[in-house]
């Protein structure tokens, strides 16, 4: 098993861990339907920036 030559200080350990935090996804409200969706993603009903960009199946 590998053994370190010099022990890492608490400061160096914490600096390495500074980028490990998690963030919540940012949600936006669709202009046409008021539905929440991920930013820069098409909403489930096919709208993006207030325009219909994807044809979705109709519920018949």
Curated annotation (Swiss-Prot):
One GO molecular-function entry: structural constituent of ribosome
Disordered, as annotated region: 1-60
SUPFAM superfamilies given in the database record: Zn-binding ribosomal proteins
Residue ranges, compositional bias (Polar residues): 22-31
A GO term from the CC aspect: large ribosomal subunit
Keyword annotations of the record: Ribonucleoprotein, Ribosomal protein
Keyword set includes Ribonucleoprotein: yes
HAMAP family per UniProt: Ribosomal_bL32 (MF_00340)
Protein name in UniProt: Large ribosomal subunit protein bL32
Gene for this chain: rpmF
């Amino acid at each position: 098993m590998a053994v370190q030559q010099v022990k890492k200080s608490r400061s160096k350990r914490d600096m390495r861990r500074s980028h490990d935090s998690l963030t919540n996804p940012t949600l936006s409200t669709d202009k046409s339907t008021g539905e929440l969706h991920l930013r820069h993603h098409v909403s489930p009903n096919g709208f993006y920036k207030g325009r219909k960009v994807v044809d979705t199946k109709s519920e018949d």
